[in-house]
Amino acid sequence: MDQIVIRGGVPLHGAIPIAGAKNACLTLMPATLLSDEPLTLTNAPRLSDIATMTALLRSLGAEVSTLQDGKVLALSSHRIDNHTAEYDIVRKMRASILVLGPMLARDGHAVVSLPGGCAIGARPVDLHLKGLEALGADLTLTDGYVHAKAPGGLKGAVFEFPFVSVGATENILMAATLAKGTTVLKNAAREPEIVDLARCLRKMGAQIEGEGTSRITVQGVDRLHGATHPVVTDRIELGTYMLAPAITGGEVELIGGRLDLVAAFAERLAAAGVDVSETAHGLTVKRANGRVGAVDVVTEPFPGFPTDLQAQMMALLCTADGVSVLEERIFENRFMHAPELIRMGARIDVHGGTATVTGVPQLKGAPVMATDLRASVSLILAALAAEGETVVSRVYHLDRGYERVEEKLSACGAQIERVKET
């Protein structure tokens, strides 16, 4: 098993290219199941989660080819000969549930195991199922599998999400494109990844209005055709690397970065004393003067502060001058990185969904263990600023969502390497 070794205290200087969004690509890939014509995705990230989704789609009968060193995905679902997404694949990744809506909409039946992924709270799929039932699906849950049927096809309906859910919005949006009549999704998620999905589906012939707002309207069509679509920039990878020069000092340009994707996050960085400016090729980030200042953070659905940047922001605030309060409103049990940061000398007090962080003058290197995807990279950020050597174990979490992180950081001067665990 791999470990990442970091020797901290080096200010970063250079440029980091930002990949296509993992969360967008994992939604776009199942969209191939809606059509019997090819779908080509460019600017795809090279991640283990993408490989998992590739394996899942192939198990259903889809063809998936990787081109240009994995940056282009060529998908074709002209023949779907298996409508069961097995537990052995689905358990590895929560996004696997996104094959349910497309298969059900196109062929009228699907069987999908309940998914896995990061161990962050309950993260139920209830809203996916309730939304599909609103479109006329007959669903039963047996032995950990969702059995879905719609022999007469799905039918448009008005469905209001009781709370905002990105995954459920994506699943039901895809299913609605082939439903008979009009579907209206109220209190829909507004994330850029949903906007990206809607744009791709529209290229495939779907009739969609309102993406990026809380009300999405879909007029169902008889069939969708093929398309070519670039995956939107990964705003979580972007935000993560924006924190690298903020926590170490120095100045880094983030190629392909877009401020509109991370506006709420950038505002909190600016409040802490970090300079963020737009360039011809992306964004430049540098720490303004001395230590960053303490700021309070509340995670919210887009366009608010992303929950997927909470752990990384905590790493920065461990080095801030003063006391910060982070309130996690999206997921329960999402402070599992705090005990590991404490091993590095951080002062963090967690009560329920709130963490109080008192900044310390200097973090210290230590052996630490990643508990989930975002926690793993928060430990790497902390290690970049720490005195001495830090060894991060269980970095397989990292490879699910970050493309060649050690290469990108070392190109900016970080002393970081991947080694085999001894």
Swiss-Prot record:
GO term, biological process aspect, one: cell division
Cysteine pairs bridged by disulfides in the record: none
Swiss-Prot/TrEMBL catalytic activity: phosphoenolpyruvate + UDP-N-acetyl-alpha-D-glucosamine = UDP-N-acetyl-3-O-(1-carboxyvinyl)-alpha-D-glucosamine + phosphate
EC number: 2.5.1.7
Residues that bear 2-(S-cysteinyl)pyruvic acid O-phosphothioketal: 118
Function noted in UniProt: Cell wall formation. Adds enolpyruvyl to UDP-N-acetylglucosamine.
Active site: 118 (proton donor)
Location in or out of the cell: Cytoplasm
Name recorded for this polypeptide: UDP-N-acetylglucosamine 1-carboxyvinyltransferase
